[in-house]
Amino acid sequence: IDVYRGRIAPLRRWIDYVFYVSFFPQLVAGPIVRARDFIPQIRKPLYVSQEMFGRGIYLIVAGLFKKAVISDYISINFVERIFDNPTLYSGVENLMGLYGYALQIYCDFSGYSDIAIGIALLLGFHFNMNFDSPYKSASITEFWRRWHISLSSWLRDYLYISLGGNRHGKFRQYLNLIITMFLGGLWHGASWNFVLWGMFHGVALALHKAWMSITGRKKGEQSHGIRRVFGVIITFHFVCFCWIFFRNADIHNSMDMLRQIFTVFLSLIHISEPTRPY
């Protein structure tokens, strides 16, 4: 696609192409490395500076800690039990399990990415960082600028823009966002839970774009103070809501978990109701 669009020249040596598509650090779980970023590095003399070596070791150790210590431990000892049988646990326990999964999946994906980036540095190659504190995002649009950055930028450049992006009016832009995230859900797996996950994110992105348009806020404009705090809380909990469907292949399990969690909020509302004097 990049060659067709004229962004890179066709490769003259087949060995460069084979090396690019088979470069092992990023094959398992990313980051997605583009040819125009990687191929020029092949042609440079191999050089690993002391800074690159130190940073590479740090990222590998940090990634292994995230994956093997945090993610795997939380998954085996906490998250799996609750997600597999949500009705056996209280609403609070289900909510804690959901928070645990949010941490687990972040440490899992970002851990793999850190390891890949670290190994690449030891071999003399630079990959872009793939996660940028995504749970600090104050909007769903900001979340997708921080979460799995190589995937979100790939979806933007090769699906969203190819569908027309924002070039054909507001309605078409919102529809393109929903279609892009729908296909992004299918990219994770051809099952209904991933489709729902992608659709939820697509609709949320479209609604946020519409809200930005209505309120006159500019692209990339950051909120501050208490407004940002509320934005972070709302965005995080929306993302967690979507994780329920991402994690559960069984829709019934997802609905059971939502019911259990919903009882927590119902009980809080009941407690907060003022008592009537008799």
Where are the language model's segments positioned?
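Membrane-embedded transmembrane alpha-helical bundles that form the catalytic cores
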Residues: 1-269, 276
